[in-house]
Amino acid sequence: MTRALAILTALAALLIAPFAAAQISPAPQKIVTPVDPLTMGTDNFTRLADPDLWKGLSIHRIEFRDARTFWRVYRVMNLRKPNGPLWFVPHDNENAAFQAAILAVRSYGGVVVAVEEARSLAGPDSRMNGDVAFGRPVDPNRNFRDDTPDYARTILADLGSPARLIIALHTNQAGFDAAESECAPDQPETSGSGEISVLLCSDLYLPRPSIRAAWPYDDTDSVAIVAFAGDRSPATGFCSRALADADMNIMFERVVKTDGSLSNYALYRGLPYVNLETQDRGVEPVGLGDARARLLAMIDVVMARCSTVDGLALRTWPPRPLRPAKRRPR
């Protein structure tokens, strides 16, 4: 009897094993490679080819496949100050955002996670990732979904517990379509092809323009975006009161159902998150520097108002040479 029971048990185990194995999803294979930022062929790194800028920073490329999409992500950590924010740059064509993130991680510490559009290493950058097995290109900031869990796990691998502050950085096209707004005036200076402006109000966005509109908020495309649950007040959004007290341009994002963005993902999980945006001003030095400077100014405000991480105020890079003071005649 005992022998027969043992045989039946073994047969049952053989039948169940394949089914059980099918329920276990293997961990995604990730290729992690240390990289030298001074020899990288991508435009983001080429523009920052200064050895002093990268001292104390550790740079790795992380490659993996999640569902139908192949991803290439760069992780930049401040080795001296690893406990700062998680700086997220999802769109490869938003060049000022990448530069601001590198300067911010040098000053405030933490980790930069920047998505490289995997097919454009030898060509113009794109905000979308077209390296897919099938279907349409994927927006890196619309991929925080239940059916792509490995993507979120990889992007937020350094989040920690308690979670560190997440600061997402973006640049976007100028202006907006006034026809899409319920409150904005139809003026030539505000019309454009963008989707982000503190003059835009809709079911999704509730604007709070800066009262003084001093730089960098003289540009209505330079804003902080704070998400809040659709059945609650905008004041419940992370750090919303403090940012309003700082007289920032703020767009309150009303979230009823997730759109796959990191702002929505963070809201539903109670993570500290702020999104900073400014107008894309191209890749020429003057325009790139202007957009970068506006992002850095807003970063300073967020770090002063919303973060417990100690750090020096951001300084413009490269530093301007100091001129000797004029001596008074004796």
Give the role of each language-model region.
Residues 1-8:
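Bacterial N-terminal signal peptides that target proteins for export
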Residues 9-10, 20:
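Cleavable N-terminal signal peptides
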Residues 23-327:
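Structured catalytic-domain cores with a bias toward divalent-metal coordination
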